[in-house]
């Protein structure tokens, strides 16, 4: 990386997407959320900050409301921020200072290499959980907490069976049913994700997993997407009937069994929610911290809008 820090704002139409995606691919902290094709599907609008000749990049995902431009975190996009080599506090601070002033409100997450104490900005920390699958399955299974092992055996005894590579719409339906947010906005997000899934599936970067009960009903499901030696566990859904029979435990175990021994991290995408954090850690997963930032430069008479 050049010793000189020259960060420029690049509007979407002028981004060199080949150089952009190459930067994400080669970055030590590269994540699938940073690729242009991921952002194209999940962000309402996005522009960019670029260091020199795409040595480091930062997507600016934004929207407009009440005439105000604001930065936000897109649906199913857990971490963004600055991607590139040798990211330190000085560089991260410079990127944040380079965000155009027209973005008066910020509320977004950075990534696990962006956790620094900064001179000009306050970052807060969020928890993710990751599990290294580069071990024999028997070793991984022994590291599960006893209650996880017990629920997996229970699901097996009750006739639950894992399935994979089925219609992603079934995953979305179960997830939305669980979230109880079947709104116009959630439907739009779901439609965008279906398009993204088809794109990733064509690249062999996505697959659906599920658990059928003894009546062959789908009681747990999710999507796994792959990039940078990570498998991201997203859009998890759990039918009420599945919660009492260990369906979600069995689903995650099925994926681990299929991928044990590979150079792969299982990325649980969170969570700061205590019960979920305990659940993920019960599989032997460890904490990986990442950063978030909120900034409100709205006029005093508008600050209530984004509270």
Feature map (PLM): residue ranges:
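Short, Lys/Arg-enriched, disordered terminal segments
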Residues: 1-14, 18, 288, 300-307
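Conserved acyl-donor/pantetheine-binding loop and adjacent beta-alpha core of acyl/acetyltransferases
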Residues: 64-79
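A conserved beta-strand-loop-helix scaffold within acyl/acetyltransferase catalytic domains
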Residues: 4-53, 58-67, 111-243
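The substrate-binding groove and active-site-proximal loops of carbohydrate-active enzymes
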Residues: 78-86
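Aromatic (often tryptophan-rich) hydrophobic motifs at membrane interfaces
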Residues: 90-97, 199-304
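Short, high-confidence coil segments that cap the C-terminus of an alpha-helix
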Residues: 44-46, 101-105, 206, 261-263
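Short, hydrophobic beta-strand segments that form beta-sheet elements in well-ordered domains
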Residues: 49-50, 104-110, 266-268
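Non-catalytic accessory segments adjacent to catalytic cores
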Residues: 89-127
């Amino acid at each position: 990386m050049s010793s000189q820090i020259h960060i420029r704002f690049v509007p979407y139409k002028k981004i060199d997407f080949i150089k952009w995606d190459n930067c994400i691919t080669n970055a030590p902290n590269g994540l699938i959320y940073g690729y242009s094709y991921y952002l194209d599907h999940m962000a309402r609008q996005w522009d960019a900050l670029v260091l020199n000749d795409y040595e480091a990049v930062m997507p600016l995902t934004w929207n407009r409301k009440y005439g105000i431009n604001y930065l936000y975190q897109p649906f199913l996009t857990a971490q963004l921020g600055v991607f590139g080599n040798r990211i330190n506090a000085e560089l991260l601070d410079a990127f944040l200072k380079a965000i155009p002033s027209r973005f008066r409100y910020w509320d977004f997450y950075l990534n696990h290499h962006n956790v620094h104490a900064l001179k000009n900005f306050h970052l807060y920390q969020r928890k993710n959980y990751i599990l290294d699958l580069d071990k024999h399955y028997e070793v991984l299974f022994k590291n599960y907490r006893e209650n996880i092992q017990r629920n997996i055996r229970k699901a097996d005894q009750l006739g639950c069976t894992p399935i994979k590579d089925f219609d992603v719409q079934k995953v979305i339906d179960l997830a939305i049913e669980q979230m109880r947010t079947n709104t116009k906005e959630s439907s739009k997000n779901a439609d965008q994700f279906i398009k993204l899934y088809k794109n990733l599936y064509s690249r062999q970067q996505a697959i659906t997993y599920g658990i059928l009960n003894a009546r062959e009903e789908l009681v747990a499901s999710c999507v796994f997407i792959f990039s940078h030696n990570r498998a991201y566990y997203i859009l998890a859904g759990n039918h009420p009937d599945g919660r009492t029979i260990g369906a979600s435990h069995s689903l995650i175990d099925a994926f681990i069994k299929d991928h044990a021994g590979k150079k792969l991290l299982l990325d649980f995408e969170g969570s700061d929610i205590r019960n979920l954090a305990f659940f993920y850690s019960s599989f032997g997963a460890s904490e990986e911290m990442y950063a978030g930032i909120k900034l409100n430069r709205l006029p005093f008479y508008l600050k209530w809008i984004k509270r």
